[in-house]
């Protein structure tokens, strides 16, 4: 993706599904996935590309094994990364445990302003539920933030769950539950230009279109562990190459973005170093 002067450049990484031990293998697929090693490989690769970037956006499902030790291990890996890391919970996470064990370079803000762009991070986690939900209080805070943003500024929203259907029946029942309410609210704020989500373990590039012709782009990002095949009635695993999304938020309010995959499959022997 071509570098553009004055663009706000971000990495998005999502769905690492980590464990307390780097030796742990992902249990819900037969594919040989060691989530901690995949995340380590991703961070090592991105570390060589950080010039000109503002932050790493980590959009949920940090943990598969939801324990303090897992979040402490993830925190250690992320604090070795030379950019601020902004993160939100996914359905596999425990938000309170994240807050208690993530620190230093790793933050859980609701609002980050970078130039004319505002990054709004929504926590769509709901205890014991695979789908995404926002409470009335969260919607109220979201609306207040939008009201506070100047009309000549721009908004990029980050959430774990997808706010539009992606065409896979088994996954679409686990998207954002209140998507209609969400889009009705966003309709009043033309500053909102784009939504980025995780959760779906596949690349998705779509949009929500309003009756008047306005569109808001929606981009889903593949995981750092295992990928799933798109447009399926039932879950089908695809491959194990970790992915990230490169994001450029331009000064005129437009967005450029592209998904990349590591050029190799992460195997247990691929990374021997202990970060």
Question: Residue locations for each model-derived region?
Answer:
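Active-site-proximal beta-strand elements of phosphoester/diester hydrolases
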Residues: 7-23, 116-125, 156-158, 216-222, ...
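Binuclear metal-dependent phosphoesterase catalytic core
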Residues: 36, 207-275
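Extended active-site neighborhood of metal-dependent phosphoesterases/phosphodiesterases
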Residues: 2, 67-154, 178-191, 209-222, ...
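Active-site environment of divalent metal-dependent phosphoester hydrolases
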Residues: 17-22, 64-69, 92-97, 127-130, ...
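His/acidic metal-ligating clusters that form di-metal
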Residues: 42-55, 132-217, 255-256, 273
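N-terminal active-site segment of His-dependent metallophosphoesterases
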Residues: 1-73
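Short glycine-enriched, charge-decorated loop/helix-capping segments at active-site entrances
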Residues: 25-33, 128, 169-174, 233-235
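Active-site neighborhood of phospho(di)ester-bond hydrolases with catalytic His/Asp-centered motifs
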Residues: 12-14, 55-61, 85-91, 123, ...
């Amino acid at each position: 993706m071509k570098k553009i002067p004055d663009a706000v450049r971000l990495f998005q990484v999502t769905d690492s599904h980590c464990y307390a031990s780097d030796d742990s293998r992902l249990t819900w697929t037969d594919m040989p996935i060691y989530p901690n090693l995949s995340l380590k490989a991703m961070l090592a690769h991105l570390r060589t590309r950080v010039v000109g970037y503002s932050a790493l956006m980590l959009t949920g499902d940090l943990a598969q094994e939801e324990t303090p030790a897992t979040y402490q291990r993830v925190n250690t890996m992320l604090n070795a990364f030379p950019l601020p890391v902004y993160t939100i919970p996914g359905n596999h996470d425990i938000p309170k445990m994240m807050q208690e064990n993530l620190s230093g370079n790793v933050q859980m803000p609701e609002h980050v302003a970078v130039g004319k762009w505002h990054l709004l991070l929504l926590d769509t986690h709901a205890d014991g539920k695979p789908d995404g939900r926002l409470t009335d209080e969260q919607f109220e805070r979201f609306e207040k933030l939008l009201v506070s943003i100047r009309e000549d500024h721009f908004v990029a929203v980050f959430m774990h769950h997808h706010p539009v259907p992606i065409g896979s029946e088994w996954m679409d029942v686990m998207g954002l539950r209140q998507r209609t309410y969400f889009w009705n609210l966003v309709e009043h704020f033309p500053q909102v230009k784009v939504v980025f989500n995780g959760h779906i373990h596949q690349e998705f590039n779509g949009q929500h279109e309003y009756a008047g012709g306005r569109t808001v782009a929606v981009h889903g990002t593949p995981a750092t562990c295992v990928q799933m095949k798109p447009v399926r009635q039932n879950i089908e695993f695809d491959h194990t190459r970790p992915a990230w999304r490169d994001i450029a938020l331009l000064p005129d309010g437009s967005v450029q973005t592209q998904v990349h995959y590591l050029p190799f499959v992460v195997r247990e022997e691929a990374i021997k170093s202990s970060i």
